[in-house]
């Protein structure tokens, strides 16, 4: 059985004999998440934060509302979609102990290719303590960048081509091992939120990636840094058009050169 989906990215829900899944048809003419997120070569690639939006929409499609927690979101292979082509992507939520297992697969002539996996569970906790923005700004007084007529440039733009929706950085203040930034969607794209996007992939992408300069030895000329996994992420609600992002560098993991948390 097939039924239409209600969220922005998904086209339909498919109910098979043994398994049900949600489908999205990815191509650059339909999804700005692809068209505005490209390698320097021009090749469109689905952003890591796009998987988080897919997960949030999948929960909504299944009637699972309220705060939730993502654990061990792991990226297994990139999802490239050449211009003029399309990829059918399946998102499966399977009940398991304490929550659901998430799998993201693309359809190919030889079968399914797995791109990402995660665990997700609903939260029944109180509202989180609000970030003390003034205190964070006071600590991070080493260097401040403020946007003028145009948004600030993201460090990753040396290796990626970002579209207009990714131009969201309004200010960054760096401290020792931490940074805080103000980000806002351009007025032309606030309507994305009205369409039902919960965790806007462009806004979230820059919110989690603007502070690469905190990493010891980071040099964008060395190549593109990409997310490998999100260990834990708690989502208490949809992102508004304007947000603050506080990033702290965790050096306790001892991952070695080329890795950071």
Language-model segments: which ranges?
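Acyl-thioester-processing domains in fatty-acid/polyketide/NRPS systems
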Residues: 1-261
């Amino acid at each position: 059985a097939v039924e239409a989906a209600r969220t922005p990215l998904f086209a339909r829900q498919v109910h098979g004999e043994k398994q049900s899944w949600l489908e999205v048809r990815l191509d650059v003419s339909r999804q700005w998440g692809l068209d505005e997120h490209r390698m320097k070569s021009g090749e469109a690639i689905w952003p890591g934060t796009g998987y988080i939006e897919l997960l949030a929409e999948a929960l909504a499609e299944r009637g699972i509302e309220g705060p939730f927690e993502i654990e061990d979101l792991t990226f297994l292979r990139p999802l490239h979609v050449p211009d003029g082509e399309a990829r059918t992507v399946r998102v499966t939520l399977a009940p398991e102990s304490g929550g659901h297992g998430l799998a993201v697969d693309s359809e190919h002539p030889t079968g399914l290719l797995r791109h990402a996996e995660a665990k997700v569970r609903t939260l029944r906790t109180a509202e989180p303590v609000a970030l003390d923005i003034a205190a964070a700004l006071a600590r991070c007084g080493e260097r401040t960048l403020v946007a003028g007529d145009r948004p600030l440039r993201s460090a990753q733009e040396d290796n990626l081509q970002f579209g207009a929706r990714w131009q969201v950085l309004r200010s960054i203040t760096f401290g020792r091992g931490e940074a805080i930034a103000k980000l806002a969607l351009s007025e032309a794209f606030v309507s994305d939120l009205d369409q039902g996007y919960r965790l806007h992939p462009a806004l979230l992408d820059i919110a989690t990636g603007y502070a690469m300069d905190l990493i010891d030895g980071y040099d964008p000329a060395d190549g593109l840094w990409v997310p490998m996994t999100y260990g834990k992420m708690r989502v208490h609600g949809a992102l508004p058009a304007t947000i603050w992002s506080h990033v702290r560098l965790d050096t306790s993991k001892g991952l070695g050169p080329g890795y950071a948390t």
